[in-house]
Amino acid sequence: ITDLGRLILARVEEFGPISFADYMAQCLYHPELGYYARPGKPTVSKNGDFITSVSVGSVFGKLLAHRLYKFWCANGSPKTFTILEPGAHDGSLCLDILEAISNLSPEFRSAVDYLVHEPLSVRRKSLQAKLQGKACVIATPDDCHAKIGALIANEILDALPVPLYFRSNGQWHEILVTSNAGSLDWDSRPAKPDLPTNLPEGYVTEGPPELSSFMTPPARMLENALFIWIDYGLDEEALYHPARTAGTLRCYFKHKTCAHPLENPGEQDLTADVNFTAVEKIASSLGFQIHPAMNQSRYLTYCGKEWLLSNPSPKEISQFQTLIHPTQFGGRFYALEMTKGNVDPASLI
């Protein structure tokens, strides 16, 4: 058992079972022992636990830079434009976007104030060292305010802790984490989540994460804004399809899917498909206008129309093909844009 596993075990032995969302939060975000708090251990790379669009190469950042530039131009090229990136991992996307913006338009680059939101102190220190003042690393956006800007969130929503439920005897039960003979084990209790009730016996699924508390601070911070969420996920109809009997929760360790979420707490990634319907509902309640989601292949192709005409190198074309390939990132990932305030959305289509 891991050090974090021992801490969680001691907690449930003393205080009783905890929700899976609570367990997942500890596994990923414990300030010293959580998966994302591990210093010096690569999680995103060919040698880590998973790859992302960012680790494919700099083209992903270039394409997003083109999208931001179009939005900036459509809204009068303001002298100050704030970009907020939550959960920036090692800062590579930030640097790729800033370099691409510099090449696109020095005027746009001088207007950009780039903020990286990272609540984990160990991550903030490493980000500050890597970014070297090119972006400001903040612990919370609560005290910040910007007239106009954008949020870029790549593979963030899938790492928000989710509760787990299963159907038994026509009722929903919440799956809990408890102790059994010195090890972590499953428990359950009756529950009444806001989930469909016409699903089969034994059906297991995730409930939505706590989206409101995550999305409200950046919505308050950016008065007029374009928010771009890129992630793997489904709408509610597909997510809670009767045939999807085992849910979407997955564990990753060194590019392999692991079978058991209770194994190696803090040492493996835990993730679940994003419920885009739930995201849209919260966004609407926060005053956003929702724009139709599209798969990453279509989205990046629209973003990169001008870039594709600029004679990119064979290496860049190879990266682009990986990013839009239907069996890789292109078909599995979706981009959801939303705008708030008095802005021109600078429609891609």
Stretches found by the model and what they are:
Residues 1-145, 298-301, 322-349:
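Rossmann-like AdoMet
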Residues 27, 151, 279:
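A residue-level signal for conserved active-site and pocket-lining positions in enzyme catalytic cores
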Residues 150-200, 242-251:
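A mobile, often basic/glycine-rich helix-loop segment
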Residues 3, 19-22, 55, 59, ...:
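Generic recognition of stable, solvent-exposed alpha-helical segments in well-folded globular domains
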Residues 84, 117, 151-154, 230:
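Active-site flanking residues adjacent to catalytic metal/cofactor-binding acidic residues
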Residues 91, 124, 160-161, 237:
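Conserved protein kinase catalytic core
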